[in-house]
Regions:
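Short, small/polar-rich loop/turn modules that mediate ligand/substrate recognition or access, typified
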Residues: 122, 162, 167, 222-224
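Active-site loop immediately N-terminal to the catalytic Tyr-X3-Lys motif
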Residues: 88, 135-141, 163-164, 199, ...
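Substrate-binding pocket helix/loop in short-chain dehydrogenase/reductase
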Residues: 86-87, 94-96, 181, 192
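Residue(s) in the substrate-gating loop at a strand-loop-helix junction
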Residues: 130
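Short C-terminal tail/terminal secondary-structure segment
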Residues: 135, 212, 223-238
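Alpha-helical segment proximal to the catalytic Tyr-Lys
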Residues: 115, 159-160, 220
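Active-site helix of classical SDR
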Residues: 110, 146, 154
Length: 238
C-alpha cells in the first residue's frame, strides 16, 4: 500500500546523530525524501551543511532545499546538546551553547522553514524535547530550560500556523540509548533504567516512530501537544 507520506520533502536537524539518523530512516521507509541538516555528513541520506546556531547558515540550508526540491512538507528539529553542572558552577559559555543549539536553533529553523511550508500545502513540524523540559533534573539547568522553552515555542507557534495548514508538536523522550549514553557510568545508566516502568531504555527507533506518527494521517487533529516516549519514566517510581 502506498504511504501517505510518499514523496514528501523533509528536513531533519541533527541528522547525523543517533536520534536524527533514526528519524531519517523511519521517514525514508515511508517514502519521504529526508534531508539531513547538520555540521557532519551522515552515512546515508541527502545532506545540507547547517549550523543551527547561525541565522545565515539556516537560511541558506532551507533555501537550498527549496531550490532543489521545490517545497518543504516536514520539519524536525532533532539537534540537541547538553552541558551538565549545578547552576552556580555552570559556565556562561556552556549555558549559551546549549540555548543556541536547542532553542535558538529551533527558532531559526521555524523562522525560515514556515514561509516555505506555507507557500506549499502546509505540513508538520516536530520538535524533539525531553522529559527534563517538563520535570527538570539535577545538574541540567541549561538543558532542561532549553527543552522547556521548546514547549512554549510549540504551543505558541501552533496558534500562529494552524490557519496555514501546519501542525507542530513535541516528542519528549526519556533516557534514550545512544553511543553517548552508553558511555556514561553504569550507575547512571542503572538509575535511569530503574525509573522506566517498562524495564528498558528508549531506543532511537522508538522516538522515530513517534515522529513518523505525528507526520502521518493519524495526527491530523493533533497540534501544540507533547507526546512522551519514556516508558513511564516521567511518572516516577511506583
Amino acid at each position: 500500500m502506498k504511504s501517505t507520506l510518499e514523496n514528501k520533502i523533509a528536513v531533519v536537524t541533527g541528522g547525523s546523530g543517533a536520534i536524527g539518523s533514526a528519524i531519517i530512516a523511519a521517514l525514508e521507509q515511508q517514502g519521504v525524501c529526508a534531508v539531513s541538516l547538520d555540521m557532519t555528513h551522515p552515512a546515508a541520506a541527502p545532506f545540507q551543511a547547517c549550523d543551527v546556531r547561525d541565522d545565515g547558515s539556516v537560511a541558506a540550508a532551507i533555501a537550498k532545499v527549496q531550490d532543489t526540491y521545490g517545497r518543504l512538507d516536514l520539519v524536525v528539529h532533532a539537534a540537541g546538546v547538553s552541558r551538565e553542572a549545578v547552576l552556580w558552577k555552570l559556565a556562561v559559555e556552556d549555558w549559551d551553547f546549549v540555548q543556541n543549539v536547542n532553542l535558538r536553533g529551533a527558532f531559526l529553523l521555524l523562522r525560515h522553514a514556515i514561509p516555505v511550508m506555507r507557500a506549499g500545502e502546509g505540513g508538520r513540524i516536530v520538535l524533539i524535547g525531553s522529559i527534563n523540559g517538563s520535570r527538570g533534573k539535577f545538574g541540567t539547568s541549561a538543558y532542561s530550560a532549553s527543552k522547556a522553552g521548546l514547549i512554549a515555542l510549540a504551543k505558541t507557534v501552533a496558534r500562529e500556523v494552524a490557519r496555514l495548514k501546519i501542525l507542530i508538536n513535541i516528542v519528549e523522550p526519556g533516557w534514550v540509548r545512544t553511543p553517548l549514553t552508553d558511555s556514561l557510568p553504569q550507575a547512571v545508566r542503572d538509575a535511569a533504567l530503574a525509573e522506566s516502568l517498562v524495564g528498558r531504555y528508549v531506543e532511537p527507533a522508538d522516538v522515530a516512530a513517534a515522529v513518523s506518527f505525528l507526520c502521518g494521517p493519524g495526527a491530523q487533529q493533533i497540534t501544540g501537544q507533547i507526546l512522551r516516549v519514556d516508558g513511564g519514566q516521567s511518572l516516577g517510581s511506583v
